[in-house]
């Protein structure tokens, strides 16, 4: 099987490549350092499996890349690399098209098993993350049942519409302030208004919302 590895740390790309290339049925055909490059490598090589770091540089997050790549290349199975502090993102990435999750500090044998599992079209989730994932699924299902049919997106101001995709892409308040020539306090105020108006509770929910509204493009 052909594999592409996307991670912003060179040591991870190199280490995982060595482990997987040692397997007779696996070949790492390319690596990438961010979401944009990952998309380009998948377009070029059409791999069977993409191993994708969830925590990517600002503007090219793993959550955004997962949605874009799974939509454009449904035959490429996406295996997410994650850390414990990324647990809140797991349910959202699953909804975006990922086939599995594995912790970066997992043993080599577990990585190999995860790759083979998603390659076969099955879902692989690290046991340490399963409870968190199930709880998030239950909470999200309950939220969906009581969600309003009205669209609060229409009441966002022009400035809030500018700031929303930047927040979703991972830019910090200072970076956004510099881009839009406003103060950091202004950005913080707009961010609060956006979260309140859209009834969003976390950054992953905001990213998912931005993806649904097609506000994020490579």
UniProtKB/Swiss-Prot annotation:
The keyword DNA-binding is annotated on this UniProt entry: yes
Q: Which residues form the HTH luxR-type domain?
A: 149-214
DNA-binding region, residues:
173-192
One family from Pfam that matches here is: Response_reg
Question: Which biological process, per GO, is one annotated for this protein?
Answer: regulation of DNA-templated transcription
Annotated compartments: Cytoplasm
User: Is this entry keyworded Thylakoid?
Assistant: no
Please provide one cellular component term from the Gene Ontology annotations of this protein.
Answer: cytoplasm
What keyword terms does UniProt attach to this protein? Activator, Cytoplasm, DNA-binding, Phosphoprotein, Transcription, Transcription regulation, Two-component regulatory system
Taxonomy, superkingdom: Bacteria
Q: Spell out the Gene3D superfamilies in the cross-references.
A: 3.40.50.2300
Describe its function.
Answer: Member of the two-component regulatory system NreB/NreC involved in the control of dissimilatory nitrate/nitrite reduction in response to oxygen. Phosphorylated NreC binds to a GC-rich palindromic sequence at the promoters of the nitrate (narGHJI) and nitrite (nir) reductase operons, as well as the putative nitrate transporter gene narT, and activates their expression.
User: What protein name applies here?
Assistant: Oxygen regulatory protein NreC
Source species, please? Staphylococcus epidermidis (strain ATCC 35984 / DSM 28319 / BCRC 17069 / CCUG 31568 / BM 3577 / RP62A)
Q: Which gene encodes it?
A: nreC
């Amino acid at each position: 099987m052909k594999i592409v590895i996307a991670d912003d740390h060179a040591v991870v790309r190199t280490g995982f490549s060595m482990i997987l290339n040692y397997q007779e049925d696996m070949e790492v055909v390319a690596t990438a350092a961010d979401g944009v490059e990952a998309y380009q490598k998948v377009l070029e090589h059409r791999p069977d499996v993409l191993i994708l770091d969830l925590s990517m540089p600002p503007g090219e997050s793993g959550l955004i890349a997962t949605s874009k790549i799974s939509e454009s290349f449904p035959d490429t199975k996406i295996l997410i690399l994650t850390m414990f502090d990324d647990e809140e993102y797991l349910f959202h990435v699953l909804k975006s098209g990922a086939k599995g999750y594995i912790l970066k500090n997992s043993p080599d044998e577990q990585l190999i098993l995860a790759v083979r599992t998603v390659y076969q079209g099955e879902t692989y989730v690290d046991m340490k993350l399963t409870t968190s994932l199930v709880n998030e699924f239950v909470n999200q299902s309950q939220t969906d049942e009581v969600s309003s049919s009205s669209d609060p997106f229409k009441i966002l101001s022009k400035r809030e519409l500018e700031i929303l995709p930047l927040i979703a892409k991972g830019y910090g308040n200072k970076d956004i302030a510099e881009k839009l020539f406003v103060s950091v306090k202004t950005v913080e105020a707009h961010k609060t208004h956006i979260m309140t108006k859209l009834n969003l509770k976390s950054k992953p929910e905001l990213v998912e919302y931005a993806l649904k509204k097609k506000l994020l493009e490579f």
